[in-house]
Design a protein with these regions (language model features):
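Hydrophobic anchor at the beta1->P-loop junction of P-loop NTPases
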Residues: 5
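The conserved Walker
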Residues: 9
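Walker A/P-loop
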Residues: 14
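Short beta-strand-centered segment that lines the nucleotide-binding/catalytic pocket of NTP-utilizing
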Residues: 26-39
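ATP-dependent small-molecule kinase phosphotransfer cores
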Residues: 36-105
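Small-molecule kinase domains that catalyze NTP-dependent phosphoryl transfer to phosphate-bearing small molecules
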Residues: 95, 124-125, 145, 149-197
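ATP-dependent NMP and nucleoside kinases share a basic, alpha-helical "lid"
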Residues: 96-104, 108-145
């Protein structure tokens, strides 16, 4: 069973997936990590990004300058759409490979930690969807801390994605992450029981 884990940025998807990684027979695929892999130095995806936006998004060492690219796209919806149109096909191809590998290893459940699950089309790879949500003020604080952003930078990142209702309307399961880690672990355990894992 493939389950997409999604929700607005800063909601705690990765924290939920960190808890899931401890389950026996479960595989977690980090789609952000997959995105990093497909944009590594020398990849076709990285070349496509540089051609579309500017060679300046490639650092002197040949790697993607994520901060520079983020500054270009997160405040401009049209540019973000163009970036996604380039990167999503590469990500989907890699996800199919990783899902097949996890199935070969005998995983009972495969969770895709995917911030852009629907936008990328990766939801088509999933049998169920888990949405993680959190209050906007908590998300803002987490994003500022996690990404070392100013309040405006974090707000721009939040504004570049759909709101929680977008994700909830498509969810089979929901976890609300507004409390401490113990409460989150309990919510994940309840999900484990519902899934029969």
């Amino acid at each position: 069973m493939v389950i997409g884990v999604t929700g607005p940025t800063g909601a705690g998807k990765s924290t939920v997936c960190d808890i899931l990684r401890n389950w026996t027979g479960v595989s977690v695929i980090d789609c952000d990590q997959v995105a990093r892999q497909v944009t590594e130095k020398g990849t076709l995806c990285l070349l496509d990004i540089a051609v579309e936006f500017s060679p300046s998004v490639i650092s002197a060492d040949g790697t993607l300058n994520r901060k520079k690219l983020g500054q270009l796209v997160f405040s401009d919806p049209e540019k973000l759409t163009r970036l996604n149109a380039i990167i999503f096909p590469y990500i989907l191809e890699r996800l199919r490979e990783e899902i097949a590998d996890a199935e070969k290893r005998g995983a009972k459940a495969i969770f895709l930690d995917a911030p852009t699950l629907f936008e990328s089309g990766a939801d088509a790879l999933c049998e169920k969807i888990l949405t993680v949500t959190s209050a906007p003020e908590k998300r803002l604080t987490r994003i500022m801390q996690r990404d070392s952003l100013s309040p405006q930078g974090a707000a721009d990142r939040m504004a570049s994605q759909p709101d929680a209702d977008f994700y909830l309307a498509r969810a089979d399961y929901q976890i609300q992450n507004d409390d401490d880690t113990a409460a989150l672990r309990l919510a994940v355990m309840e999900l484990q029981n519902r899934l029969g894992l």
